[in-house]
């Protein structure tokens, strides 16, 4: 199958699957509407919510940091991890945004992606094609070819199940000796300091409890007012990504703890003894103050808008390429927020499907039009 | 994507567009005799308070389609006079296209005349709406030119406009938003009452009509009421699943525009072999890859 065949199939599949999920679980639509309102509150007052979130994390016995840009974020995490460690990553777009994996590798750490798609991208030295399904453009044969490098028993005739099992075996050997687990966050609750993550593979569960240190790194846009909102966000994200119910929802509130003796909560227990939340600004705060741009911060990265975009469906990852892990309609907005790069917007054909399918009802074409305008001002007269 | 090429192309297009629009109200030199002959042939009244507004869209659709091809020629030329003479030679629609758009425009005129006897046309004095400026993101230039268009309509004492394509309708909607353009306008599709038509089609939605101007349902009702059968498939014609013909990216990347058109034509023809469109640019883009008809070719 070539890209155009894969994407046509996947797009039609996602469209119908999400429609069915919304019929079977009609409350998801209400949750999405409520979530939009709650996220708007945060955008209107981002500084306050960042502070509230950081205070909540510290109260739990965790540590919270705010990095203003990529360099600061890398330095904070680099210092926490140190050198010659084994680090397991769950899929995190922010880590791509700041070039974290390469940075840690350069500092003599062994770093492994544990999400299957992301792992395939890592071992084939590629770049994620889609925020939810990073290896969307890979066929079974291509995946087998990549995995053969770590397990010679895999060949081009191997079944998908065998490829998955080979990766699982390999990753298990890394989990047991991992010093640090690095995850992203689907949402962070300002009131409780909890990080919510949704997944199906089980790798995030392991990444967040097995290594003695858990670092969650995410953008300040992922902050929501309450724990309830955080759980809403993971449910809505999973539904609009087309996988519902999700196999796992993970909530982490500080380092592991127990209150089993005399009901006194102490840390650590079985899981990590250290929990760090690294919040990244990298253009988000500025965007929250820009009337034309701020709606983009509502994005919950469900990846649905990609499928309704004619440019993404034609160019795939070549559109925004390695400039950003965000692609498709949301990627045009997010590549601008994080890199100040207006050019991918020039290709927007204002097809408008993106705004129809977006759970957060972001007027994506309108935001992109603004970015186009910024680009047009930079074009020589 | 080739960022440097895009920057260069955008700069050239803007210069060519702005120069032509500010001097002559058209985006590139075009033969107005050809563009207006449809109206001369049926004696459409000149001017009037209610006008049919073509914005040259049906007449220029094929040129827009090949805009990227023309732009380097425009860009390498100096004064507007040279552009005009070379452009006039370059930009002449094919005979068969002229015949086709004349018939479409005349049919649309007859359809709208049923709801209002006194509909005029500005002939050579009709301005192009400026859609391309808006769609390429040249907002400052769009507003500046929009004011000129608004003034021109006022000079002609126009108080009611009937649009016939989605790009112009969308542009007037935005002129209203950005510069207070307050002359009422209605797309002709919303004025159709007793039209008749036949055939079985899959509708390729105009992105602007269906996803920006709230006409997704009403367009279907109009077509079906005329007796035309529409075949639907939610993954192809659903409001959020259907996608563009590729036209708008044509000026920057013709190859990409064609690839989108080809992909769109493939999904559409998987539903039904004959495709119906509501926009001249959709027609120009898709007709290379499938059998397409404009709504105004199947209802009368
Ligand atoms: S912009 Fe909307 S549809 Fe696209 S990824 Fe974000 S939330 Fe999902």
Regions found by a protein language model. Give the residues of each.
Chain B
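Short cysteine clusters
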Residues: 129, 207, 245, 279-282
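Ferredoxin-type iron-sulfur electron-transfer modules in oxidoreductases and energy-metabolism complexes
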Residues: 1-18, 255-263, 295-300
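Redox- and metal-dependent alpha/beta enzyme cores, enriched for Fe-S-associated oxidoreductases
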Residues: 115, 197, 201-256
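Helix N-cap/beta->alpha junction signal
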Residues: 164-166, 278-280
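A short, acidic, amphipathic alpha-helical segment used as a generic capping/interface helix at domain edges
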Residues: 150, 256-273
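Phosphate- and divalent-cation-binding pockets in alpha/beta enzyme and binding domains
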Residues: 170-174, 284-288
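Short, flexible loop segments at boundaries between secondary-structure elements
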Residues: 181-201, 234-243, 290-300
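Iron-sulfur-cluster electron-transfer modules
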Residues: 1-126, 135-163, 169, 179
